[in-house]
Amino acid sequence: MQRPSGRAPEQLRDVTITRQFTRHAEGSVLVCFGDTKVICTASVEAGVPRFLKGQGQGWITAEYGMLPRSTGSRMGREAARGKQGGRTVEIQRLIGRSLRAAVDLTALGEHSIVIDCDVIQADGGTRTASITGALVALVDAIRYLQREKMITTDPLVHMVAAVSVGIYEGVPVLDLDYPEDSNAETDMNMVMTEEGGLIEIQGTAEKKPFTDEQFAGMFSLAKKGVAELVALQKAALAQ
């Protein structure tokens, strides 16, 4: 089996995480998984949604979007249509769930952090890149809250990252790009903590069912990939 990119089955794309990418947001990151590039910002807002008022805890939510020419042909803006698509809603909810699992919301106090993930170029794995980059932006927003003495303890409980795995030409592979994703027999996204705890698994057999053995192979690759991504997150945060 030869991957279109020439990578080994267990090999991530080249991943870079650039912090402080924009001026205004409390946390901002440009994350690149190969040719997939996403800007992730984390904005601190006073207060929490109405359903949390008076409960002494914070909130993290996310929005996700793709620039019209982030793909091979131009997509119309969802804002121009006046309605978000189902895929967009699904992905931004996934990002929010994943990041809330990384923190102790009570330690945030009654503050909200809004994550915005904007895909500027797509080549597969935009949701996993978004989660991985957004975690770093979130940490920078938390550091802002600590510097400004708006919170007294660190709410971060887990480092969290996400990666795609799949079955391509019968072989489990890590971090699918678009040519693989569009031809994979199975496509799966896994969100995990640094310790290997599972936050979410999204998987679909596209052409034929996958076996227990194949799932175990994909799970093993995902754990390896997440460990490498967390190391990159930590390296970025240490700069």
From Swiss-Prot:
InterPro entries: ExoRNase_PH_dom1, ExoRNase_PH_dom2, ExoRNase_PH_dom2_sf, PNPase/RNase_PH_dom_sf, Ribosomal_Su5_D2-typ_SF, RNase_PH, RNase_PH_bac-type, RNase_PH_CS
Catalytic reactions of this protein: tRNA(n+1) + phosphate = tRNA(n) + a ribonucleoside 5'-diphosphate
Residues reported to bind phosphate: R87, G125, T126, R127
EC number: 2.7.7.56
Subunit description: Homohexameric ring arranged as a trimer of dimers.
HAMAP family with a match to the protein in the record: RNase_PH
Name by which UniProt lists this protein: Ribonuclease PH
